[in-house]
Amino acid sequence: VKECLEPAASARNVTIELSGDSFTVRAAYKHIYELVENIVSNAIKYNKDGGRVEITLHDVGETGCIYVRDNGIGIPKESLNRVFERFYRVDKGRSTKEGSTGLGLSIVKHIVNCYGGTVTLDSELGKGTLVCVRLPIAKNISE
């Protein structure tokens, strides 16, 4: 995902950093790809010039955690409980300009729920956003 989104990040002068543990989750590759792509794409779109997106992976026992943190524009507190709703856009003017449909985070939530995981989002207006996805780790490759 990082390599695919580098051109979009570069066009906005946003740096993507990847770190952490390697793990395998019980999920289809295409779903995990779509999940991470949606989150990172938002982190790039709603960032500032010279911004940063950090993708951190952690193997925490039976759970794989994917953290995506940005130092972008953030989300107002009153919108936090609605961002996973289909077609919800925090700033309709900016979202339209950015080509947003308001489906990205609802797709993320759906994928995570299908695989028995959780997704949380914390944000501060003007400071950035942290998205945390937790999914069950596959104990062996046949899972």
Predicted segments with their positions:
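Glycine-rich G1-box
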Residues: P7, I73-G74
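Short helix-loop "hinge" at the ATP-lid/N-box region of the Bergerat-fold HATPase_c
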Residues: A43-I44
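Conserved glycine-rich
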Residues: G116-G117
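Short conserved segment of the HATPase_c
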Residues: I75-R89, K109
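Acidic ATP/Mg2+-coordinating residue in the GHKL
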Residues: D70
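Short beta-strand/loop element within the Bergerat-fold HATPase_c
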Residues: G50-E62
